[in-house]
A protein has these predicted regions:
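Conserved alpha/beta-domain cores
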Residues: 1-176, 180-195, 201-203
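A short, acidic, flexible beta-alpha connecting loop/helix-capping segment that sits on the rim
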Residues: 194-198, 213-216
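Active-site-proximal glycine-rich helix-loop-beta segment
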Residues: 204, 211
Length: 216
């Protein structure tokens, strides 16, 4: 598998002004030059979803790009990544919020995060349900070192016409939260992947997580 230069350039142009988060789970640490190749093409942000693989790449990558954590994160792994990533996308339970607060406070830093919402109420997906979101936001005062910047969602694997409904629901939820919680800078919406990013962009996504489409 090699970097698909034409696809990378095309996608970078298509997602503007949203940020392309290159999901690099397909890139082995022995192929770290692929990250450097992506960076030369204009990719500045890499998304990892496995802590051990991320740490290996982090130690071996010598470029100027940033890393974000886009996968499900176990609370006991927070301490290994909190000072190495610029954003944690998938805060999906209170135990994770508490651990991020604990580890960020230890290091005297603010950790930007997104709250993962299970907008379609899928049993197979992580995230808070819509009905729980206000409770989450009302609890944020207990986590002064956690800086919530917006929402993250994963669309169900269904027809694109149906998927669009869930992107719209997430966009509208963020807009309501912006009005109801003006004390927080809620300006990020992480949704859309290789197979559905066009629909996500139509509904205000600011971060597109793409992996397989960048390679061939």
């Amino acid at each position: 598998m090699i970097v698909n230069e034409e696809a990378v350039k095309k996608i970078l142009e298509e997602v503007k002004p949203a940020k392309l988060v290159a999901a690099t789970k397909y890139v082995d640490v022995k192929e770290i030059e692929k990250l450097e190749k992506l960076e030369k093409l204009g990719v500045t942000c890499f998304g990892e979803n496995r802590v051990q693989a991320f740490l290996e790449k982090y130690e071996n990558y010598h470029g100027n790009g940033e890393f974000q954590f886009i996968g499900t994160l176990q609370p006991n792994k927070v301490k290994y990544i909190i000072d190495k990533v610029t954003l944690i996308h998938a805060v999906d339970r209170y135990s994770l919020l508490k651990e991020i607060e604990k580890q960020a406070a230890k290091r005297d830093l603010e950790m930007p995060v997104l709250i993962q919402v299970n907008i379609a109420k899928e049993e197979s997906k992580h995230g808070f349900e819509v009905e729980e979101i206000d409770e989450v936001f009302n609890s944020l005062k207990d986590y002064p070192h956690v800086k919530v910047r917006g929402l993250m969602m994963m669309a169900p694997h269904i027809e694109s016409s149906e998927t669009e409904k869930y992107f719209k629901m997430t966009q509208e939820l963020l807009q309501r939260l912006q009005k109801d919680y003006p004390m927080y800078q809620l300006d990020q919406l992480s949704m859309g992947m290789s197979n559905d990013y066009h629909e996500a962009l139509n509904h205000g996504s600011t971060m597109i997580r793409i992996g397989s489409a960048l390679f061939k």
